[in-house]
A protein has these predicted regions:
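Short, helix-capping/interhelical loops that line the mouth of catalytic, cofactor-
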Residues: 107-133, 181-229, 289-293
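Low-acidity, Ser/Thr- and Arg-rich intrinsically disordered low-complexity segments
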Residues: 3-21
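Long, well-ordered alpha-helical segments
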Residues: 143-151
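Short, low-complexity, charge-dense intrinsically disordered segments
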Residues: 26-27
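Short, linear, compositionally biased motifs with a strong N-terminal bias
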Residues: 12-13, 31-32, 282
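Alpha-helical packing segments of well-folded alpha/beta enzyme cores
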Residues: 133-140, 144, 173-176, 217, ...
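Tandem repeat scaffolds
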Residues: 31-114
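Short, contiguous alpha-helical
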Residues: 153-208, 230, 247-293
């Protein structure tokens, strides 16, 4: 699974593994879902998967989560006491996260802005700010694409640790632009490319093309990307503060996002956020693929 956007309540948590131990000797039995009631003692169990489960309010004590994998999960309001975090990799949206009494969010934000000075421009509030932000997006993507072109073509379809391949990443960005720009802002009744790829946890929708098994060439996807990025460029080039502060006109046809009126700022900010984050993920995975190639 590759969707690296902010988690959703309906997200699939495929791949999440919990290893639950007690001090009591017992045969190893595979854990089953749904989740145990709070306070229930579970004997040693083999690795299992919990998918689309609700653990709200659950209590885990003397539990071994070593090498566990959490994807598209909510930890809002979670409390960890006496936790041992070592060699832990966390990637996600963080707000009001305190470790040993210290809110780490400002520290993480400052370090990310130090590593990527242009990142500070990617949360615009006015039309000129959006023009600056889109200029950043247009500048950072070409070197990433050139890096991908140096790999054997088959590696561009290869996933790294279950994350989207490079071509799947580009397909998803086409889908994001089709949804939030071509449909929501431009009001097109049929905005979608058949090669677009929605986030993995999206519910099936016959009105939105989504073929995870498609294997288009890099050139095919880049042609689509060029067209979609040009569309965004044209919209932002003529954007005014009044338009940015307004709402989109609802599109009556079924599709995604659902028919309704959306803040123009939200639509454009979503696309910019997707473009920025997925390029970082692509760069990370390209480095691994380069070692394989």
């Amino acid at each position: 699974m590759a969707a690296r956007n902010r988690p959703r309540r309906s997200a699939s948590t495929a791949g999440t593994s919990f290893i639950i131990w007690t001090d009591e000797p017992a045969d190893r039995e595979e854990l089953t879902t749904p989740a145990p009631d709070v306070g229930t003692r579970w004997q040693a169990g083999r690795v299992t998967e919990f998918v689309k489960q609700d653990f709200t309010g659950a209590r885990f004590e003397q539990v071994d989560f070593s090498r566990a994998w959490f994807r598209n999960v909510y930890f809002t309001g979670a409390t960890l006491r006496g936790a041992w975090l070592e060699d832990v990799d966390i990637d996600g949206e963080i707000r009001n996260v305190r470790i040993n009494g210290v809110d780490i969010v400002p520290l993480v934000e400052a370090e990310l802005n130090r590593r990527y000075p242009e990142r500070a421009k990617l949360d615009p509030a006015d039309a000129d700010g959006f023009r600056e932000a889109w200029t950043v997006i247009e500048r950072v993507w070409p070197p990433t694409v050139e890096r991908a072109k140096r790999l054997p073509p088959e590696l561009l379809h290869e996933r790294v640790e279950g994350e989207w391949s490079f071509i799947e990443t580009l397909r998803h960005l086409v889908s994001a632009t089709d949804a939030w720009v071509r449909r929501a802002i431009l009001g097109l009744s049929e905005p979608y490319s058949p090669l677009g790829l929605r986030h993995d946890e999206a519910e099936p929708d016959p009105s939105v093309p989504n073929d995870p098994d498609a294997r288009p060439s890099l050139d095919e996807v880049l042609e689509l990307r060029t067209d979609r990025m040009h569309t965004v460029h044209e919209i932002i080039a003529t954007l005014t503060d009044d338009v940015l502060a307004g709402q989109t006109d609802p599109v009556p046809a079924p599709g995604y996002p659902p028919a309704g009126s959306y803040p123009v700022l939200r639509c454009l900010r979503t696309v910019i956020n997707e473009e920025w984050l997925h390029r970082l993920y692509a760069e990370r995975d390209l480095a691994i693929l380069e070692r394989r190639g």
